[in-house]
C-alpha cells in the first residue's frame, strides 16, 4: 500500500459514471472537518483517507508497523504471490468500515423503534449527534486495530496466547467492579470457581484477566470470553494499552473490545427473554441503545458477513490470483439496513438488492476455504510451523528464565520479553530479547537458535525434503473409502491422535513411548487402559509397515474436517433481508434457492510420508491394505 501526499489528489481527464460514484462515496466516507488527512493508495479500493492524527499516533507507531511483518495468510507454499500482510488488511477493513457505518446511520435515520416513552422514534434519535460522532470514531479505531495483536504466521501459533504469561500485575480480584459483577450475577458460580481455582493453582496472569482490568467489563472474565479467537483478545489488550489516549473511559474501551471480539451486549439466546412490557422508560431506552450498539459491533465482527471477512475474501483472491466470483462490496455494504424483527426489537440486515452479492461473498469464502485453506500443502506447512513453535516454547521454558512467554503481551510491545539462559546451560543465542514479535523473529529463532532442537525446521526450509500426502484431496479420499469405511478410519485416527490433537508424527519413538506407557500402567495396576494403548500401537505399526522402508522415516497423520459450505450454517440461512413494503423481513433461506448442502460433520485425515527411492506408493493398493489391516486389528480387540 502506497501512501500519498496530504489532501485529495486531482486526477486528469473525465471520470466514468462508476468512477464518479466511487469518488463521491470516498468523499462521503472521509467526513472532512477541521482535521487534516493523509491519503493511502490501496490496490483494491483506490484512495483511502485517514485523519493525520490517527496516522501519526497509531499507524506510524512501531506497534502498528509491526503488522507489515505479519503475513495475512499461510498460502505462500501454494500461491507464491500470497505475500500481503495484516497492515494493508487493517487499513482496508477501516475503509470498508466507514462505508458500512454510513449505511447504518442512513438506515437509522429512516427506521423507527418503540421507545420508553411509549411512542415510536427514529432509531437515530437513540444517540445524540455527539454520541454518533464518537461512536463513528471508536468504531473506526476498532476496525483499524482489530488485528494489532495478531500472532506471527497467520493463525498457526495464536493459541499459545491463551496460556501465555506476561510481566503485568493483575489486580482485578479486589476491584469493586469485579465484586459488583459477582453480586449482580454477571458471573456464575462456576465462572467464579474457575477463576478461584486458577488463583489457587498459582496462576498470576491471564489475557482475559488483563482485558477485564483494562475495560472493567465482566464479560471478558465470563465463560463467553472463550468464544473469541486468542488473537482478538490480544489485539484488544494491545490496542487499549498502547493507544489508551484515544479512549475517554472504561465504557469506550469496553465498546472497542466488544467490536473486535464480537461479544454483543445482548446475547442472542437471551434476546427472546426480555420482557419489554415490564421495563420502565429508562430500562427500555438502555435496551434500545444496546441493540443499536450490537448492530455496530456486528459490522466488524459477526458470524455471517462483516467488513473484516469481506476485506480478506476480496484481498486474498485479488492478491494470490485465485479465480473466484466477483464481490461488489459497494453494493453489499450500502445494502446494510436495520430491520424490525418484532414490535420491540430490531437487528442488522440487508436490503433485497444485496442478495446476489451475499451469495457471491459466501461462494467466494467457500471456494477459499475448500480449495486453498484445505489444500494438503498448506495444511502440512501449518503443521511444520506449529510443531516448530511448540518445540521453541518448550525449549525456552526448559533452558531459559523469563517473566514472560514468547507468545505474550510483553513480546508484542516495546517492553519485550527477555530470555536468559539458566545457570549451567549454554545457548547458541545467548540472552534473547524479543519485542514487537513478528514472522521475522520466529524465522530468526528457527534458523539461528533452535535449528538443531527442532527437526521440522529443516523440513520447513528445505522444501525438497518435505513429506508428500498419500491422497491429495478430500475428493480422492472419498473415492478410496466409502462412508462406513470412513467412519472406521476416523475412529482409528482418533485413537492414534489421542485427546485434543489434530496431528502427530508416527515413528519408532512414538511406538517406544506407547510401550513405556503400557509398562507404567502395568506397574501401577491400571490394567483397563492397556488394551486401548495396545490397539493404538497396532494401528501405528500397521501404517508404518505399509510404507517404503517400513516407515523408517516416519509418517505424519493430520486430521481435518470435510468441507462444509457456509450456506448450510443456520446463521447464514437466518440472515435478515428487507423488501420495501413488507412489515417483516424475510430470511436469506426464504429468498435464496441455493441454500442446500450436505451437513457432513465427518472428520478425515491426510497421511504425509517420504516416497524414498522406491517412488510414490500405489494409492489404491495402500488404501485396500490399510482397510484390511485395520479390520484385522478391530477384530482382535472386539
What feature does the model see in each segment?
Residues 1-141, 148-638:
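Histidine-centered, transition-metal-coordinating active-site segments
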Amino acid at each position: 500500500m502506497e501512501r500519498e501526499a496530504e489532501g485529495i489528489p486531482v486526477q486528469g481527464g473525465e471520470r466514468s459514471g462508476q468512477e464518479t460514484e466511487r469518488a463521491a462515496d470516498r468523499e462521503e466516507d472521509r467526513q472532512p472537518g477541521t482535521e487534516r488527512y493523509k491519503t493511502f493508495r490501496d490496490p483494491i479500493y483506490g484512495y483511502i483517507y485517514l485523519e493525520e492524527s490517527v496516522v501519526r499516533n497509531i499507524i506510524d507507531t512501531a506497534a502498528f508497523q509491526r503488522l507489515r511483518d505479519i503475513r495475512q495468510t499461510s498460502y505462500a507454499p501454494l500461491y507464491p504471490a500470497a505475500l500481503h500482510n495484516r497492515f494493508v488488511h487493517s487499513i482496508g477493513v477501516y475503509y470498508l468500515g466507514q462505508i458500512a457505518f454510513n449505511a447504518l446511520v442512513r438506515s437509522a435515520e429512516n427506521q423507527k423503534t418503540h421507545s420508553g416513552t411509549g411512542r415510536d422514534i427514529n432509531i437515530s434519535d437513540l444517540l445524540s449527534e455527539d454520541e454518533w460522532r464518537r461512536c463513528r470514531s471508536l468504531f473506526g479505531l476498532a476496525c483499524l486495530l482489530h488485528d494489532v495483536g495478531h500472532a506471527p504466521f497467520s493463525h498457526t501459533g495464536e493459541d499459545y496466547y491463551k496460556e501465555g504469561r506476561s510481566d503485568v500485575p493483575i489486580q482485578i480480584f479486589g476491584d469493586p467492579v469485579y465484586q459488583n459483577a459477582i453480586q449482580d450475577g454477571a458471573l456464575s458460580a462456576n465462572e467464579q470457581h474457575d477463576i478461584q481455582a486458577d488463583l489457587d493453582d498459582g496462576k498470576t496472569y491471564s489475557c482475559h484477566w488483563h482485558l477485564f482490568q483494562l475495560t472493567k467489563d465482566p464479560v471478558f472474565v465470563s465463560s463467553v470470553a472463550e468464544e473469541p479467537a486468542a488473537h482478538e483478545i490480544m489485539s484488544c489488550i494491545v490496542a487499549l494499552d498502547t493507544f489508551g489516549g484515544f479512549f475517554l473511559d472504561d465504557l469506550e474501551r469496553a465498546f472497542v473490545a466488544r467490536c473486535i471480539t464480537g461479544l454483543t451486549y445482548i446475547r442472542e439466546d437471551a434476546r427472546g427473554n426480555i420482557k419489554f412490557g415490564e421495563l420502565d422508560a429508562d430500562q427500555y431506552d438502555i435496551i434500545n441503545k444496546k441493540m443499536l450498539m450490537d448492530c455496530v459491533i456486528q459490522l466488524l465482527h459477526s458470524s455471517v458477513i462483516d467488513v473484516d471477512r469481506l476485506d480478506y475474501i476480496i484481498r486474498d483472491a485479488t492478491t494470490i490470483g485465485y479465480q473466484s466470483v466477483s464481490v461488489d462490496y459497494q453494493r453489499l455494504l450500502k445494502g446494510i439496513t436495520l430491520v424490525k424483527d418484532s414490535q420491540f426489537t430490531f437487528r442488522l440486515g440487508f436490503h433485497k438488492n444485496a442478495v446476489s452479492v451475499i451469495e457471491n461473498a459466501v461462494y467466494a469464502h467457500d471456494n477459499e476455504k475448500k480449495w486453498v485453506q484445505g489444500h494438503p500443502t498448506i495444511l502440512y506447512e501449518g503443521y511444520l510451523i506449529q510443531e516448530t513453535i511448540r518445540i521453541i516454547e518448550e525449549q525456552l521454558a526448559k533452558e531459559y528464565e523469563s517473566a514472560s512467554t514468547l507468545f505474550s503481551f510483553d513480546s508484542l510491545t516495546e517492553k519485550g520479553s527477555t530470555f536468559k539462559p539458566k545457570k549451567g546451560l549454554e545457548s547458541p543465542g545467548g540472552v534473547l530479547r524479543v519485542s514487537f514479535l513478528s514472522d521475522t523473529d520466529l524465522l530468526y529463532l528457527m534458523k539461528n537458535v533452535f535449528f538443531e532442537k527442532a527437526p521440522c525446521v529443516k523440513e520447513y526450509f528445505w522444501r525438497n525434503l518435505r513429506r508428500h500426502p498419500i491422497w491429495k484431496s478430500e475428493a480422492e479420499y472419498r473415492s478410496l473409502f466409502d462412508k462406513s469405511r470412513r467412519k472406521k478410519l476416523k475412529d482409528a485416527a482418533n485413537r492414534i491422535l489421542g485427546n485434543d490433537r489434530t496431528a502427530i508424527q508416527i515413528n519408532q519413538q512414538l511406538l517406544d513411548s506407547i510401550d513405556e506407557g503400557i509398562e507404567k500402567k502395568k506397574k501401577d495396576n491400571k490394567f483397563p487402559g492397556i488394551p486401548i494403548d495396545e490397539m493404538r500401537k497396532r494401528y501405528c505399526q500397521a501404517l508404518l509397515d505399509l510404507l517404503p522402508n517400513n516407515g523408517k522415516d516416519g509418517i505424519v497423520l493430520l486430521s481435518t474436517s470435510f468441507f462444509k459450505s457456509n450456506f448450510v450454517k443456520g446463521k447464514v440461512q437466518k440472515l435478515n433481508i428487507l423488501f420495501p413494503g413488507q412489515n417483516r423481513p424475510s430470511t436469506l433461506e426464504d429468498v435464496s434457492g441455493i441454500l442446500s448442502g450436505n451437513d457432513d460433520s465427518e472428520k478425515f485425515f491426510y497421511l504425509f510420508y517420504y516416497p524414498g527411492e522406491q517412488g510414490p506408493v500405489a494409492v489404491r493398493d495402500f488404501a485396500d491394505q490399510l482397510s484390511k489391516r485395520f479390520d484385522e486389528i478391530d477384530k482382535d480387540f472386539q
